[in-house]
Every structure is written in structure tokens, then in C-alpha cells.
């Protein structure tokens, strides 16, 4: 385990009020990694990838393959190599030796490491983060076009990967996002390192931002 050096940093976010068009500012104090930022972020990112895999690959051993109970030919006198079953691993259609089986994989990672990695990537993502006071400009019904228009008003390009972070996934918003290729929607308390790293633009509501720093607080 590498020795971590952290420092307390205040992240200042400009908040866009969509109704008045004014800009306010809000700041949050957090601890970020200084000397081993790449190490801790890579560790959390790779473990998250491993835990997201479903180890469902499965093969059958000789005893599990159907058939093969009868000896193919007698033990001696044929001139052939001796054989006891047509389901031997040496035969086509036979069992598999040491093949994959479904398994449960667990990798332990400390909560402090997750928090440190998340705050570090959020700090690096500050230039590409847009904070809005609310999503009041969006209709209460399913409308992909309205969502695209809303994002364009924030100068967010849908040619890149966009991540919208909200305090709660509302059904109309979720269904509106589903039809846009490079757009993902995530709830604030489910935010993770991988989502932030892969996104090239972040759109966060003010309430969601408060939930993020409350959920992953140092205390």
C-alpha cells in the first residue's frame, strides 16, 4: 500500500439560474490526493470494473456431459488406444478440464479510498462541469427534443459523452435521456469514479451537488 498525501481543497462551482440567467457561486471543502492521485483513482476504477463483471461462463466436466456411460470398445485386442468413455476430455464433445465456472468475486476497497478517488476526479472535472439551479426548464412529460434543446442552451455538445447528475431519477427525464446516444443519467448518491472519468461533460443540479458532498462527506 502506498503512502497517501492529501490536502484540503475548496471547489468553487458557478451555479446557473435558468430563470433569471444570473450566476451564483457555491463552494465545497474536500480532501484530494496530491502525490498518488493516479494510483488511488486507477485502483478504484479497476476494482469497480472488476466488480461490474458477471462471472457466468460455465463449462461441463466429464461427469456432467450427457452420455458416455458405455465403454466405446473393449480394453484389449483392437489395437486402438484404450478408452473408457466417449465423453473423455480427449474426445470431441467430451468434458472440459479446468474450464470456467460461475463464481462470486469480491475485492475489498476502503470507503476512504473511494471518497478520495471521487473527490480527486471531481476536482479534475471542474472545468467540464456545469451546475444548474434546477431543471425547471424541462417539461414534466417525456420529450427528447426538449432535453436536447435544454442541453444546447447550456452549450453542452452531444457529440461527446454527457453525464447528467440529478437528486432523483424522475421517469419522464429518464425516458427522455434513454433515446440519446451519448447521454447518461445518474442519481447523485450513486455517483462513481468511472462515470465521472468517462464523461466529457457533466451537468449537475444544485441539489444533486449538495447530496454528493453530503453522501461522501469526510465525517
UniProtKB/Swiss-Prot annotation:
GO terms for cellular component: chloroplast; ribonucleoprotein complex; ribosome. This is Large ribosomal subunit protein uL4c. One of its GO terms (biological process) is translation. Residues 53-81 are annotated as: Disordered. It comes from the Eukaryota. Part of the 50S ribosomal subunit. Disulfide bonds: none annotated. Residues 68-79 have a biased composition (Basic residues). The gene is rpl4. It comes from Cyanidium caldarium (Red alga). Pfam families: Ribosomal_L4. Belongs to the universal ribosomal protein uL4 family. Keywords: Chloroplast, Plastid, Ribonucleoprotein, Ribosomal protein, RNA-binding, rRNA-binding. It is found in: Plastid, Chloroplast. InterPro entries: Ribosomal_uL4, Ribosomal_uL4-like, Ribosomal_uL4_dom_sf. SUPFAM superfamilies: Ribosomal protein L4. GO terms for molecular function: rRNA binding; structural constituent of ribosome.
